[in-house]
Amino acid sequence: PFAWENTSKYYDTQKQVAEDIVKGYRAFIKDIYAAGCRNLQLDDCSWGMVVDSSAPVLFGTTKAGLEKIKEQLLDVNNKAIEGAPKDLVINTHVCRGNFHSTYASSGAYDSVAETLFAKENVNAYYLEFDDERSGGFAPLAKVSGEKKVVLGLITTKSPVLEDKQVVISRIYEAAKYVPLDRLYLSPQCG
């Protein structure tokens, strides 16, 4: 939705764009599965942008309009992976950008938890939690079913290692919202 000015040169409606995105992802998933892939991580920058405080300006809408955009994003994602082989593990990494050790967006997951965590049909989420710009763990309470959560607690933006006890305590803090046996640890960029 935020690139519509340029996209409208090639498409008459946003629905047509969404349909082509779905087709493209389905073809890609079919091809990589045929090549032997059984674990697919989709890096999705859209959700990271939606939680940013500048999202209404970026998307050219109001906060209420962002609700419609979240539903559109969810619809495209779920349609894109619909019909994927049952033995293909599909995960979403909510990417906030990591170009030259900086980032493109900030914001807690609270505003997308009800849509993304509760309704996206994936096996796991890779989520950035390496600094305060990602907010707290409470939104993880919305993670539905048996989905796994990979906590990106280890930063790639600094050569300084995290304190082991701090990392352990943050994992236990996240376990208040998602059972410990469904939590995993990774660098913030998945």
Question: Residue locations for each model-derived region?
Answer:
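Domain-level signal for soluble alpha/beta catalytic cores
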Residues: 1-190
